[in-house]
Amino acid sequence: MICFSGNRRGIDDRTGMNNCLKALKQIVPVAEKANVILNMELLNSKVDHHDYMCDRSPWGVELVKRVGSDNFKLLYDIYHMQIMEGDVIRTIRQDHAVFGHYHTGGNPGRNELDDTQELNYKAIARAIADVGFQGYMAHEFIPLRDPLTSLGEAVELCVV
C-alpha cells in the first residue's frame, strides 16, 4: 500500500518527521495486524510536487528507522530521486533494505525508458536484482508513443 508524507506548508524537516511519526505510530500497527506493508513514496519537490516533505532518500530512510517496523518501507521512485539527488544505483545498494517497491520513469519528461533520457535502466534493474529485491517494480511513466509498445519495451529493458 502506498502512502505519502504530505506537504511541508512551512514546517521544517524535524517537525515534519515528528508529524509523520505521530501518524505512522497509529497506522503501522493496523498494517502489521493486517500483514500489509505501507510504502511511503519518495517524490521530487523540485519539478512535480513542490513542497512535498519526503523528497530525499536520507530523510525517508531516517523515518523508516524511527518507525521501526518491517511493515513500513519506502517506495523508491527512480524518476523522482534522479531529479532530487541522482546517484540512484549507489542509493539502491546502500539503502535497499528499506525499499519495499520501485517506480520507473524516464528523465527528463517522465516518459519512456529509452535513449532520450538520462537513466540507464538496465544497470538500475541489475542493481535492484543484485541486492536480492523480490518485490515489484512498477512502470509509472507517460508514454509519448503507443502505450502497450512502450510498456513492453520498458519491461524488456528491466529484465536482468
Predicted regions and their residues:
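Active-site acidic/histidine proton-transfer and metal-coordination neighborhood
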Residues: M1-K73, I83
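Histidine-acidic metal/acid-base catalytic patches
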Residues: I37, C54-Y76, H80-V160
